[in-house]
Amino acid sequence: MKHEMVFTFLLMMVRPEASTSRIPRRRTTFTVEQLYLLEMYFAQSQYVGCDERERLARILSLDEYQVKIWFQNRRIRMRREANK
């Protein structure tokens, strides 16, 4: 057991990326209801503040990070469509 810990420590010293290896996060699939509400909020305001993001996440049973990224991606999609 002790040898395994020493080996792991030495491996992390030599190859730092070995300590950060992790399973990639699965892509979020939004429900129709979640998308509807997110689009409604986006139509009102393209930017959502911290408090509103927290509230939206709670209502939709999502992480704040997921709501934040959804708004970022939606703004990018809107700009891309406007440039066509």
Swiss-Prot record:
It is found in: Nucleus. GO terms for molecular function: DNA-binding transcription factor activity, RNA polymerase II-specific; RNA polymerase II cis-regulatory region sequence-specific DNA binding. Its main location: nucleus. GO terms for cellular component: nucleus. InterPro entries: HD, Homeobox_CS, Homeobox_NK-like, Homeodomain-like_sf. Residues 23-82 bind DNA. Keywords: Developmental protein, DNA-binding, Homeobox, Nucleus. PROSITE patterns: HOMEOBOX_1, HOMEOBOX_2. GO terms for biological process: cell differentiation; regulation of transcription by RNA polymerase II. This is Homeobox protein ceh-7. It comes from Caenorhabditis elegans. The lineage of its organism: Eukaryota, Metazoa, Ecdysozoa, Nematoda, Chromadorea.
